[in-house]
Amino acid sequence: MVWEVKTNQMPNAVQKLLLVMDKRASGMNDSLELLQCNENLPSSPGYNSCDEHMELDDLPELQAVQSDPTQSGMYQLSSDVSHQEYPRSSWNQNTSDIPETTYRENEVDWLTELANIATSPQSPLMQCSFYNRSSPVHIIATSKSLHSYARPPPVSSSSKSEPAFPHHHWKEETPVRHERANSESESGIFCMSSLSDDDDLGWCNSWPSTVWHCFLKGTRLCFHKGSNKEWQDVEDFARAEGCDNEEDLQMGIHKGYGSDGLKLLSHEESVSFGESVLKLTFDPGTVEDGLLTVECKLDHPFYVKNKGWSSFYPSLTVVQHGIPCCEVHIGDVCLPPGHPDAINFDDSGVFDTFKSYDFTPMDSSAVYVLSSMARQRRASLSCGGPGGQDFARSGFSKNCGSPGSSQLSSNSLYAKAVKNHSSGTVSATSPNKCKRPMNAFMLFAKKYRVEYTQMYPGKDNRAISVILGDRWKKMKNEERRMYTLEAKALAEEQKRLNPDCWKRKRTNSGSQQH
């Protein structure tokens, strides 16, 4: 039975209170005993009642309402009558400062009330800070599969009509392409708009998905063996590879091609369709399959066996895809998605590579910023909490020095700062804050300096720089473009991370003239 309380003060503010009606052959007295109130008010219904009439002086007129027999019995009270659906403990009343009048009509349930209690400022849960959302360290330690191929999402219903790609025992492919999220994320480096702490999902919405083997969309393939030796897009090849058509006999030799990985034999930089690309030659490991030559973008990431994510231009890759990478070398074996060595590989390999280098403030690239983030992560893990970030910052202070200590206690550091036209204010948390990134020629010289030093063993570093400068002047604009793009990407990233870098430098240079 349902009772409705009508009052003239607040006719619209009616709250419903569920009563569990005893369906057994018992009186109303037994069923009303299930109602528990924390306050003993005169207006509360008493136990001495019958099914037809209740004589209470302060209780408004009660009218019987016809209800659906399939629904549960409800007892409706005016909002000025204190009541609760379930008994709450005393700490709930103290910690929740949200009044009951703020709840909307008919939308309050037990879970909502618990959520309001848990998220209140006085809640013990909200007083515990597990991590800082603005810290990049949280992003690195989010998922165990940080440097593994992401699992593709379930294929949507709209893609069922398209020909599906073959799924081998090591392959996990999907026609769905993961677009890179907005770079204006709170991470500062990793370009993601949302994060998931679920180890099964990881960062699958941010990592690029491969179309075939380890190659991304936009890659062109050319097989050295087979009837079709022409250049073809990886999308067209994957679509034809997925069609189980007996007429396409030329595709038969490519079934399971490079299942154990593709070994890099050679690489060169060329121009294709007016764009600078990488021309790579791979060996699948079997003589009958033949070699494979591909043309891919400069920032194309590869997952290398026993190394992790790698790229020919790590700075471009981390800006474009948000993937910290090592450098690719001849002999590296690029693994496909789902390969056992790619799944079980230790995720910290890339950061271990960063740890082997001693970066200086001159290395103002995105890779250096990532290495700093990795050191913060290791420091936070060793300290066992958010205090590790302070430990990492203190480590930076020891290496780079604070504004006061660098000028008072170390004249050599101050002289070096003046020589390099630095601003004189070195941040403890960002060692490369006052350093401009390398330009196109510096990137070119950094890549070929070791090679030219080996070619001319009798020449010193200055002579090698002169030779590199002559080589740079003789290069065509198409050949320089790849370095220009990388330098531009580094400059934009540096300006985004440290917008006052150039401004402070001009201010400091002006003060030095006086």
UniProtKB/Swiss-Prot annotation:
Gene Ontology CC entries for this record: chromatin; nuclear speck; nucleoplasm; nucleus
DNA-binding region: 434-502
Any one GO MF annotation of this record: RNA polymerase II cis-regulatory region sequence-specific DNA binding
InterPro entries (UniProt xref): Ataxin_AXH_dom, Ataxin_AXH_dom_sf, HBP1, HMG_box_dom, HMG_box_dom_sf
Gene Ontology BP annotations: regulation of cell cycle; regulation of transcription by RNA polymerase II; Wnt signaling pathway
Compartments, as annotated in UniProt: Nucleus
Coiled coil: none
Chief place of localization: nucleus
Region (Disordered): 150-182
Top-level taxon of the source organism: Eukaryota
PTM comment, free text: Ubiquitinated by the CTLH E3 ubiquitin-protein ligase complex, leading to subsequent proteasomal degradation.
Function text: Transcriptional repressor that binds to the promoter region of target genes. Plays a role in the regulation of the cell cycle and of the Wnt pathway. Binds preferentially to the sequence 5'-TTCATTCATTCA-3'. Binding to the histone H1.0 promoter is enhanced by interaction with RB1. Disrupts the interaction between DNA and TCF4.
Assembly mode: Binds the second PAH repeat of SIN3A. Binds TCF4. Binds RB1.
Record's protein name: HMG box-containing protein 1
Name of the gene this protein is made from: HBP1
